[in-house]
């Protein structure tokens, strides 16, 4: 009986170990240009931060989730300890300054492979949509 049960459950476990789906569909077509602190430019696509399609930022005592799809630009204004002050420029032209963890890990893909960076190591991120 144990052999039969184990033979039935082994395929289930194998299928359950499939690879993750990757970036959510809302960010798959987003391309970004990252300007790092050394002045180097990096062209990436399908960006995520902390594995999410939005940024968790603070404005005073309130935490917000800002969708990457609504952004045109992220500028890191300053880094002090574990906190980075960033300016978000939205597609509608509005700008706002927020606090975020300086150790926020963002990822993307490039022609070279997968890329990752911390916001504290970046000057600016420009969002490009519809470009080839």
UniProtKB/Swiss-Prot annotation:
Signal sequence residues: 1-18
Entry keyword set: Signal
Entry annotated with the keyword Signal: yes
Name of the protein in its database record: Uncharacterized protein aq_796
Source organism (scientific name): Aquifex aeolicus (strain VF5)
């Amino acid at each position: 009986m144990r052999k039969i049960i184990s033979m039935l459950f082994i395929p289930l476990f194998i299928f359950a170990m499939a690879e993750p789906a990757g970036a959510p569909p809302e960010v798959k077509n987003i391309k970004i240009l990252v300007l790092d602190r050394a002045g180097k430019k990096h062209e990436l696509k399908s960006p995520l931060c902390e594995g999410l399609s939005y940024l968790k930022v603070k404005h005073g005592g309130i935490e917000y989730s800002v969708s990457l799809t609504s952004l045109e630009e992220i500028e890191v204004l300053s880094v002090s300890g574990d906190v980075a002050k960033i300016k978000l420029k939205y597609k509608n032209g509005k700008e706002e300054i927020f606090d975020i963890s300086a150790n926020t890990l963002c990822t993307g893909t490039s022609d070279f492979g997968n890329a990752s960076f911390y916001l504290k190591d970046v000057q600016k991120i420009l969002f490009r949509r519809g470009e080839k």
